[in-house]
Amino acid sequence: MRGPCCWPLSLLLLFLQSWETQLQSAGPRCYNGPLDLVFMIDSSRSVRPFEFETMRQFLVGLLRSLDVGLNATRVGVIQYSSQVQSVFPLGAFSRREDMERAIRAVVPLAQGTMTGLAIQYAMNVAFSEAEGARPSEERVPRVLVIVTDGRPQDRVAEVAAQARARGIEIYAVGVQRADVGSLRTMASPPLDQHVFLVESFDLIQEFGLQFQGRLCGKDLCAELVHGCQHLCVNAPGTFYCACNSGYKLAPDNKNCLALDLCAEGTHGCEHLCVNSVDSYFCRCRAGFALQQDQRSCRAIDYCSFGNHSCQHECVSTLAGPQCRCREGHDLLPDGRSCRVRDFCNGVDHGCEFQCVSEGLSFHCLCPEGRRLQADGKSCDRCREGHVDLVLLVDGSKSVRPQNFELVKRFVNQIVDFLDVSPEGTRVGLVQFSSRVRTEFPLGRYGTAAEVKQAVLAVEYMERGTMTGLALRHMVEHSFSEAQGARPRDLNVPRVGLVFTDGRSQDDISVWAARAKEEGIVMYAVGVGKAVEEELREIASEPSELHVSYSPDFSTMTHLLENLKGSICPEEGIGAGTELRSPCECESLVEFQGRTLGALESLTQNLARLTERLEELENQLASRK
């Protein structure tokens, strides 16, 4: 037996007329409430003419079962293929006859199948108020019926989900070759009530009757798990939730919230108002207690409980009791005990030379011969001194990068003390580990700012500790005239300053002695695990003036006083002269220079005076 898809056109039309008659006689028209109903008809080239005629007759028959009108159900129709075309919008017609006439006049587009594009159009245009859809606050159900015969050529999942999220209920009707997966992707849940696959024409009649029943009279509240907390209310083709008196619908449109009595502003609560089932009560914020009037709040005095154990003072906070120390004291890690504050601990005091704690404050001191400046922290500078200073810095792996940065900062503090210039103090820097590297020689930089910038740019070497190799490099290269040292006949003092944190991995004795033989005044600064015997072997005599030690890198700053007071030009100073300060040292040198100059000038003047007297004597003798 041939199926309906193979019937002659005359027999098909006769069948459609019979189906339309059955649909009209299946029951009364729907009067349960208004709908905004849009039909989205596939008119792609895959829909054959007699198939499109079937869909047309289906629409006409379904319209005759609806109570259409501007105040009842509004109907709109769009057709789509590769593009979307509005047959008539929701607000166009109020009479069924006008709608039928427009449907019978539709000419198929006969192109592709862009179903996703059509859903986008329905969501943004067809269901807009401009097209005749009623405002959302009127709660008129919006229903989209998609009728298609094939697989979409674009994506439908995302746009269909967006449409459903906007409250559009989607029915997906597939004819013969339609893709079931796409139908299920587009339709609203539950899918068994929103997805229809029509495999033959006789099932179109069955679908029409089922669909009419869905739109007209089904008790969805009774048949579905609606999820309403209080009340479920049927609407044509859908339902909505409502709440009992004294409640309002929550944003999820299912649960109910008690009316906010606190929002009325008459509760009188000092802090917080909390709604209950049929009333409200007051609550205080953390750290406060509710008073007897059940409205006002008072801060809780945690210190009054007597269990805080604070050594000095107890302060009640919202989080509980906290201990506080009196002025000039610091709270210990136990959070209870106090210790007298050492204002000189660390480097924040700002003193250039020495910091002295004094009661609840501190004051700065300068070496003898130098005066404290108006800022109360810095000291006046000595007059120009002539020194060639080479710094040997330990860059071995035991130092570690963070401590190496502290060494660089310490070096720059020494540079701040010096009068760096080509004619004054020249500074060179050598870093050593398993090898030796000249970072910059004596003659490269002529200002303290340039030297400090170069020090900050020095990169950490890591590896071993070859102090002996570094001393050899200093003796043979660093104090050479090629590296910027001044000639020996100028008698410019040569000073070597070694920073190290551990035992050398090579012998230092030979080159430490050689450095002193070459007239280099050696200073040794040890930090952490530095070996005292090696420091004394490196340094010049007396060792108490040339050796400095600090237990760790963070406390090196106290060494500055010793070093700054020791590095001083020695030219022209005789044995036995007591050097009390750098300024006194330079003053003696300057005094000797000026005295010698004055004596030489006086001698020259006396010689000229003698010559003049001899000339006068000769003149007197010739006159006789």
Swiss-Prot record:
GO biological process, one term: extracellular matrix organization
Compartmental location: Secreted
UniProt cross-references to Pfam families, sorted A to Z: FXa_inhibition (PF14670), Matrilin_ccoil (PF10393), VWA (PF00092)
Domain of life: Eukaryota
Source taxonomy: Eukaryota, Metazoa, Chordata, Craniata, Vertebrata
Signal sequence residues: 1-21
Effect upon mutating residue 319 to E: In strain: C57BL/6J
Keywords recorded for this protein, A-Z: Coiled coil, Disulfide bond, EGF-like domain, Glycoprotein, Repeat, Secreted, Signal
Domain annotation VWFA: ranges: 36-215, 388-563
Glycan attachment sites: 71, 307
Protein name from the UniProt record: Matrilin-4
Any one GO molecular function term: calcium ion binding
Gene Ontology cellular component terms for the protein in this record: collagen-containing extracellular matrix; extracellular region; matrilin complex
Gene source species: Mus musculus
Paired cysteines (S-S): 221-232, 228-241, 243-256, 262-273, 269-282, 284-297, 303-314, 310-323, 325-338, 344-355, 351-364, 366-379
Task of the protein: Major component of the extracellular matrix of cartilage.
Ranges where the EGF-like domain occurs: 217-257, 258-298, 299-339, 340-380
InterPro entries recorded: ECM_Assembly_Org, EGF-like_Ca-bd_dom, EGF-like_dom, Growth_fac_rcpt_cys_sf, Matrilin_cc_sf, Matrilin_coiled-coil_trimer, VWF_A, vWFA_dom_sf
UniProt tissue specificity: Lung, brain, sternum, kidney and heart.
Family annotation (PANTHER family): COLLAGEN ALPHA (PTHR24020), MATRILIN-4 (PTHR24020:SF14)
Gene3D superfamilies in UniProt: 1.20.5.30, Laminin, von Willebrand factor, type A domain
Subunit comment: Interacts with COMP.
Coiled coil region boundaries: 590-623
Principal subcellular localisation of the protein: secreted
